[in-house]
């Protein structure tokens, strides 16, 4: 049953910001981060670190701006190895809501990859790694990692997760208790839902631009709220539509406010 009480102002989210040019050790030593923020290591980065936020709401976004300013002052930079991950609180999701989230994300995923680029940049997935760390739902279905049609037919969470992970149900408790599983390297990471209670969106490129991150967080929140609050799912787009201006349809489909719509226009994200 849809959860009509979820709002964009109250829904909690978190961000993970990957950067290079400042090592984990130096970041821990020199950065005066807001309370609850932490620095972690990431082996995929060159002389880099990952900055992880505590749970936030949109009213706390000034903390993100503060952290990005700190990083720039200390010489941080981003490369094709860097990304931004957005976690959204998974509270309130039942089986049908999770199905709708998968359907809605898949429907707009070609546009999500366009939006996921930093301003005037190529998405890191185009740099020879074929979205290695943020696989599209369509690719995961096509290569047999997950039976998408079977997911939509599942009548219980156990059956849904069997098909999401591609394992028998007796293996699920072991998988749920582990932070790491290969399926976390998908653009929509639902392993995070089982491990820490969040839905993770891994599509986004590295950036030190707060406006990029604000737009991406808004997109993720709107996808989650659409899936929680409305039984009707988004209609999939045809390949040719990814080359047209989709902003009107995106705004209508996700319920973007006029201010949110301007947010995407202002940063020259690729709509055509």
Show the residue positions of the predicted features.
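C-terminal accessory/tail domains of diverse enzymes
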Residues: 1-78, 91-272
